[in-house]
Amino acid sequence: MRRRSLLRAPLLAAPLLAAGCGFELKRPPPLRFSRLALAGFAPRSPMAAELRRQLPGTVQVLPDAASAEVVLRAREDVRERSVVASTPAAQVRELQLRVRFSFQADTPGGRELVPPVELLLARDMSYREAAALAKAKEEDELFREMTADIATQVLRRLAAVAL
């Protein structure tokens, strides 16, 4: 019994040590504005949905750009899928998935806050026709992760904006 309690002691001490050193879970960066408008996005854009999801609760997303402090304009929001490798029998063996997002941020008056920026993420994925359904799910998950990564990068750039 004593041996078991000695083995548990380090497990119980680890969270206390982590809390004592200032460790914190990653949070979205603080933004210096409270009203944002998203412009130029497709009606059901996964990127716009992810940006809304990641925005802190202190920022209100407005439908009208005129009443916002910052307007985030999507210039390009594209998901691409291309074949990288195939067999001599023309069966696909590897795909490359890309998410390309370009944007700029300005005030409703037209003052540029973030110049036009293009972000591109790519992931390679193996493919087998025998597992097509599983690979389709994996592809969706990779696109979702890349979209979340790009949204995080956009928010970091918006955090540097000074009005």
Task: Spell out what each predicted region is.
Residues R2-L11:
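N-terminal export leaders
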Residues R73-E118, M125-K137:
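Surface-exposed short loop/turn segments
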